[in-house]
From Swiss-Prot:
It is an enzyme of class 6 (ligase). It comes from Solidesulfovibrio magneticus (strain ATCC 700980 / DSM 13731 / RS-1). This is Pantothenate synthetase. GO terms for molecular function: ATP binding; pantoate-beta-alanine ligase activity. It comes from the Bacteria. The lineage of its organism: Bacteria, Pseudomonadati, Thermodesulfobacteriota, Desulfovibrionia, Desulfovibrionales. GO terms for biological process: pantothenate biosynthetic process. Homodimer. Beta-alanine binds at Q61.
């Protein structure tokens, strides 16, 4: 596996792949990789002749007071995991290499970005779309793989990809969970022992919502109230940032539940904010 840090070197290599007609799979990450990232890399490996992964803690997707400086970093560890997952090229640029000092251009999808995470992180997805656009232009991927844990990001990037004509196949990789149901996240290492003990309750609350839909409940409000009660009882150290029932494509609120609906949440602990979701698609007939 080759590690590249300069965009110009990656651009030159990607040009060679294009001329050779090679299919390229791409997995963008912020590093501190775990088994969830590994699953995305293996998905890409199964769909392309060449696999590129990026490790870049993108400063433009962090807002004031967020955890940019505290976000865990370990490139040596990341390189070992990426190599084991079948990655051919690991791109690990610096912020200075990715952004000109006078950079003033942004890419955003405001209709989808205002919901869910965007309500409390208004500039987050602008940063995500901008850096992914830049990475797409460098890598020229045939297929790009993103985790479904950040469902909103996946929806936004699909829209951006279609609107800007990148022509990349966007694939969503299933959420990978710990044995107790907690969604894998690089930020989980920053939970206190007590918070880590309670954190699986996030997924349990969403599973409760999914079960209520399966049992015939159609009132989203009643379901969300039940999930809030579950969180109050089982995740008392967490503060709900949002808890919503939305259309999986438009991200608009769903009420009543008469079609597949996404239950999505973000919960804040002392030093970390965790997101999770479940798709309730198995509606009673």
């Amino acid at each position: 596996m080759e590690i590249i840090k300069e965009p110009s070197a990656l651009r030159e290599l990607a040009g060679q792949w294009t001329r050779q007609g090679r299919s390229v799979g791409f997995v963008p990450t912020m590093g501190y990789l775990h088994a969830g990232h590994e699953s995305l890399m293996r998905l890409a490996r199964g769909r392309a002749e060449t696999v590129v992964a990026s490790v870049f803690v993108n400063p433009t997707q962090f807002g004031p007071g967020e955890d940019l400086n505290a976000y865990p970093r370990d490139l040596e560890r990341d390189a070992a995991l990426a190599k084991a997952a079948g990655v051919d090229v690991l791109f690990a640029p610096s912020p200075e290499a990715m952004y000109e000092p006078a950079a003033a251009t942004w890419v955003e999808v405001p209709t989808l970005a205002r919901h869910l995470c965007g309500a409390s992180r208004p500039t987050h997805f602008r940063g995500v779309c901008t850096v992914v656009s830049k990475l797409f232009l460098l890598v020229r991927p045939t297929v790009a793989v993103f985790g479904q844990k950040d469902w909103q990001q996946l929806a936004i990037l699909r829209r951006m990809n279609a609107d800007l004509g990148f022509g990349v196949e966007i694939v969503g990789g299933p959420i990978v969970r710990e044995a107790d149901g907690l969604a894998l996240s690089s930020r989980n290492v920053r939970l206190t022992p007590q918070e880590r003990e309670q954190a699986p309750g996030i997924n349990q609350g969403l599973a409760l919502a999914e079960a209520m839909v399966r049992d015939g409940e159609t009132a989203a409000g009643r379901i969300l109230d039940a999930v809030r009660a579950h969180y109050a009882a089982h995740v008392p150290l967490g503060e709900i940032d949002y808890l919503s029932c939305v259309d999986p494509d438009s991200l608009e609120m769903v009420e009543p539940i008469d079609r597949p609906a996404l239950f999505a949440t973000a919960v804040r602990f002392s030093a970390v904010r965790l997101i999770d979701n479940r798709l309730a698609a198995d509606l009673p007939r």
